[in-house]
Amino acid sequence: MLNLSPLFFTTLDDESCMHDELDLTPGQRAWIASARTDVRDCLRTGIPRVLRANGYTEDVPQPRFFTQGSWAYKTLNAPAQHPQQADVDDGCYLPMSFVSQTKRPSTAATVFFAAAEEALKPLVEERRWKLVTDKPTCIRIVIAAYAHIDIPLYAIPDEEFVTLAKASMERYGYDSLTEAVNMAERDAWTALPADKVLLAHRECNWMSSDPRPVKEWFLGEVEAKGEQFRRVVRYLKAFRDWKWSSGGPASILLMAAAAPLFEKRDRRDDLALLDVVAALPARLRGGVNNPVEESESLTERLGQAGVEDAAKAFEEFEKVLRGATGAGSPSQACIWMRGEFGPRFPNEPDRVKVVSVAATIAAAPATAGPSELVGRTKAG
């Protein structure tokens, strides 16, 4: 049998591995971080300025920010092919008491979107970025061919707004306002929970949606299962991004589906990935729910045809991955893996190890081990 793990992950600086190839370059990460800081600064001063200019006489609070999604989970992969982009989610929060000063929630949602977009315009024009305003739950700023920043807008309970920690890094259409005011009869703040985080939505006004529990859940899974679990999630995303140039199963779906399937395999990322991939099709077909909100189906979002498409893709992937680990030729194994992951998988058959069946079995732990510390210095 073959041990392909050195080509998936290594801690040796002078050897390449797919895990490192999935990272954005240091220059790209620095550019994104700098752009995010500039966007935050722009919104921090710009939203209060725009609102005051449009008649809000009361003291307008500065928004707070909370990074969510793959940048926060350390599962962000560089794009695999055009037109993919690295997606950085940076939530923008205002306190509920301020947002609910408007008579109707729909008005408040529209005002929040419009104020943020108006505030961002000078920065976007100066940097020659692109402002995308047709996403229902966020404002998107395309900052480079390889990356964009998504800014979802939230109303948060006042006491949580006060305690929300600041991150360590740092078309105003009146027609649509009129439309919003005239929308739904149920358009009253009393219909919305005052103790929940609400996400502004361009069509649905506000939705109960708090990104923080998902982040806490995933980081808790990594703490319990070790860094190998985080790497396996990144490999699943890498396969998806090579298989589907757009679409495919969402990252949160892959994370939630993989978590109960994962078993730590000592220094064998290839086998840890194979364990998950082998069980993934049945798990997808059986339905996967949000791990922090069981009433929310993640597979439903993908649709029945999308779920079946993904399940079949992972069935084929499992055959290839199992065939590669059982192959007699390291060169053939590398060719097969590059077919599944693209050129980011190293074509270095001389680093593939031939191992016995007994050694492969020994890589599986009898019991769950402690949190893995090796590799935490590397970007993940």
UniProtKB/Swiss-Prot annotation:
Enzyme Commission number:
2.7.7.-
Q: Give the stretches traversing the membrane.
A: none
Catalytic reactions on record: GTP + ATP = 3',3'-cGAMP + 2 diphosphate
Q: What's known about how it's activated or inhibited?
A: Primed for activation by Cap2 which conjugates it to cellular proteins.
Q: Name one Pfam family in it.
A: DncV-like_NTFase
What does the entry list as the binding residues for Mg(2+)? 87, 89, 150
Which GO molecular-function terms appear in the entry?
3',3'-cyclic GMP-AMP synthase activity; ATP binding; GTP binding; metal ion binding
Alphabetic keyword roster = Antiviral defense, ATP-binding, GTP-binding, Isopeptide bond, Magnesium, Metal-binding, Nucleotide metabolism, Nucleotide-binding, Nucleotidyltransferase, Transferase
Residues of crosslink Glycyl lysine isopeptide (Gly-Lys) (interchain with K-? in acceptor proteins)?
Answer: 380
- NCBIfam families documented for this protein: cGAS
Give the family per the record. Belongs to the CD-NTase family. A01 subfamily.
Q: Which residues take part in binding GTP?
A: 68-73, 237, 251
Look up keyword Plastid and say if it applies.
no
Which post-translational modifications are recorded for this protein? In bacteria expressing capV-cGAS-cap2-cap3, this protein is conjugated to about 130 cellular proteins by Cap2; more conjugated protein is found in the absence of Cap3.
Q: What function does this protein fulfil?
A: Cyclic nucleotide synthase (second messenger synthase) of a CBASS antivirus system. CBASS (cyclic oligonucleotide-based antiphage signaling system) provides immunity against bacteriophages. The CD-NTase protein (CdnA, this protein) synthesizes cyclic nucleotides in response to infection; these serve as specific second messenger signals. The signals activate a diverse range of effectors, leading to bacterial cell death and thus abortive phage infection. A type II-A(GA) CBASS system.
What induces this one?
Answer: Part of a CBASS operon consisting of capV-cdnA-cap2-cap3.
Please provide the Gene Ontology terms (biological process) for this protein. defense response to virus; nucleotide metabolic process
Primary enzyme class: transferase
The UniProt entry, under InterPro entries, shows:
DncV-like_NTFase, DncV_C, GAMP_synthase
The UniProt subunit note reads as follows: Forms a Cap2-CdnA complex. A Cap2 dimer is bound on either side by a CdnA monomer.
How does gene deletion manifest?
A: Deletion of the capV-cdnA-cap2-cap3 operon (plus neighboring gene Q024_03603) results in about 10(4) higher titer of phage PaMx41 in this strain.
Binding of ATP occurs at 140, 209
Tell me what this protein is called. Cyclic GMP-AMP synthase
